[in-house]
Amino acid sequence: RFKKIRRLGALPGLTSKRPRSGNDLKNQLRSVKRSQYRIRLEEKQKLRFHYGLTERQLLKYVHIAGKVKGSTGQVLLQLLEMRLDNILFRLGMASTIPGARQLVNHRHILVNGRIVDIPSYRCKPQDIITTKDKQKSKALIQNYIASSTQPQEELPNHLTIDPFQYKGLVNQIRDSKWIGLKINELLVVEYYSRQT
């Protein structure tokens, strides 16, 4: 993880750690001119590691986004932002996306009153995300919310949370302008368009 954030910059979905800022020798050596291919590859890797996707999963999302009307890059980010594991992370119910994925896989999360154990489940507007009534599930979420470094005002406007009832609400489709990650999604689309 630390090698990834040193190379690609801050990846809040992967870890809460930040790369060290300093003018050490390594940073000076890295200022060598990068090729266009490498720039596109690094943007793709940033997106992949932030959301915790395999190469195959990301390629699938790029293909889906390409078939939808609108900017492929914007649609791609919207698809990734509306995944259940990412919504839990954005709500502050998990400290990282892999942590949110584990909550979903272990069947602690309900969407509209039904257990969902698929982290890639695509949330829709008006979906209500809650925990199971079991004490263990509530304790896990309570610990995450209590230790959350994300202040309430940083909650994206497409989400609402009630921390006392362990309940989140998806208000609308995510606006891809606010993803909390410095990324040029067009370079990711270009990377894949040149691969085929």
Curated annotation (Swiss-Prot):
GO terms, molecular function: rRNA binding; structural constituent of ribosome
Keyword Lipid metabolism (UniProt): no
Gene Ontology CC terms: chloroplast; small ribosomal subunit
Pfam families referenced in this protein's UniProt entry, alphabetically: Ribosomal_S4, S4
Listed GO biological process terms: ribosomal small subunit biogenesis; translation
SUPFAM superfamilies registered for this protein in UniProt: Alpha-L RNA-binding motif
Parts forming coiled coils: none
Entry keyword annotation includes Acetylation: no
Record function comment: One of the primary rRNA binding proteins, it binds directly to 16S rRNA where it nucleates assembly of the body of the 30S subunit. With S5 and S12 plays an important role in translational accuracy.
Similarity remark: Belongs to the universal ribosomal protein uS4 family.
Protein name: Small ribosomal subunit protein uS4c
Higher taxonomy: Eukaryota, Viridiplantae, Streptophyta, Embryophyta, Tracheophyta
